């Protein structure tokens, strides 16, 4: 019971011998180091071979037929693995094995002609890299991906020279992907120079005709807290998982004391809960003047918390701020449609079946629109087809 790269059956017997794969095999990232005993740490994952030394782990992977080590920055464990292998199998065997990997890796370079002609003609490169035609096509793709979820009263597009207020954001410190702490952030979503390409900068809600509120989908700490599992929330306010399953499907690793990973009854928090406050407080300050929410969506979002306070909602999945401003100004028409369902609430999320598509009950906004897979509006409020 070992990780795939350590499995002779998976790599050597099946992949190499039975299915005849002759290409490069690379390990997952960071699987050869000693694991961190802390559950809430991005430690190495040498599953099933914790009793081997780092060099011995490298040797086992090499002898299985793997060619590259993902995330390893130090050649010494590979060299030590070679020396151990020479003692165990002989230098001829080890050299032949290393040459096999060298051939596989180098063939990828040979096939693309990088050895025969590794040089570039600068003028030719300029015709392709950053070529105006491709830049325009790429930017249009950004615009086409933006989804208009709500447009109450046809607020969008905003007229040129509309006085627009954009509030600052605050995100508390949180753990990043590698589990290190990220500092808190004060964010100015839009520069004055960029906004004034279409609109007039307003320093306060009182001066503004409309507000653009930039927020992100809920940012969580990855499901761990104080050595235990907690829910990963898709809502902004603290979420207590009352409807989560009592017994988890999977568990556990050697770092865990309990095979049950259930987080039922536990509470998860988001680093950007203040994004919700930003929408609510901006709406209060703006009164009857329109508030447009610009949502950067990293994952499906429970929109029920902020949607009632928004006159319009634009959702995007990684486009530039310029693209969002151009869309708000009507430079392009909305063509984007949701690639996921946006759930009604977290209870629905907990009850849905992870291996079945489209079984979520999607959120319905005050305009009667259902934020289901494939949903999107045009500026006239008609659903895209």
Residue ranges of each PLM-predicted region?
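Short acidic/histidine-rich active-site segments
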Residues: 21-38, 42, 56-60, 64-75
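Helix-enriched interaction subdomains in cytosolic or periplasmic regions
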Residues: 96, 102, 107-147
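A polyampholytic, Gly/Pro-enriched intrinsically disordered region
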Residues: 45-56, 60-61, 338-339
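Short acidic (Asp/Glu) and glycine-rich catalytic loops that position anionic groups and cofactors
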Residues: 35-42, 61-62, 74-84, 117-124, ...
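Short, hinge-like loop/turn segments at secondary-structure boundaries
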Residues: 41-46, 309-313
